[in-house]
């Protein structure tokens, strides 16, 4: 069973172990935002149980369960920052956001593959605007799974995810995409899912940069998920006992 499957089964079956997070508490050198702090500032937050109730009957969840069995984790970069642990968390955010945003199954398929392979163009963990473009050159294995429009949409999303929002339309025209609104909607979800996992890099996530209202409801959860599941080299050897205690 892959790491994706192991973690998602725990997540879906409501068996994850979350430590209680308090404002200003320091975990692995990261400060986190508490649910109480966020809601006091006007950002209503979804709890873990809320999220489970929302997605448990969704056909998107069923597709996710089946699709992650087919992932070749060797394609994911070997990195503590942008490797498998990041992709697992970001893909869970994509699932939640897609359900909250009432995304169709067909659009979700594109969105899920986009987040799984969005960082395969990386050669290091530094800021690199070109890693999205470089990733598109490695997507040939997906081409037979989609029609031209859908495959170009995935390439557009992956190339654009590492660029500023003001470049979205320029890249959109490059791929001659017909369903522009759909492509831009998928891109927003990908960028937000990626951003929600930035608690691994920064003291806390700046909510104002999130693009959808649904994403702003997941900030506390993202802090909890990172704290509970972080295959960081600092404690890679004991994460299994921590996760399944």
Per-region residue spans from a language model:
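Acidic catalytic motifs of isoprenoid enzymes
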Residues: 69-75, 145
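An active-site-proximal "capping" alpha-helix that borders the catalytic cofactor pocket
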Residues: 89-97, 130-144
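Outer-membrane beta-barrel translocator/channel fold
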Residues: 60-67, 167
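Inter-helical turn/loop segments and adjacent helix faces that build the functional surface
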Residues: 101, 141-150, 209
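Divalent metal-dependent phosphate-bond-processing catalytic cores, especially two-metal-ion Mg2+/Mn2+ enzymes
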Residues: 2-55, 74-104, 163-245
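His-Asp-centered metal-binding catalytic motifs of divalent-metal-dependent phosphohydrolases/nucleases
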Residues: 90, 106-126, 131-135, 155-164, ...
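Alpha-helix C-capping/helix-to-loop hinge sites
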Residues: 78, 97, 120-123, 142, ...
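Alpha-helix N-cap/helix-initiation sites
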Residues: 80-87, 104-110, 128-129, 148-151
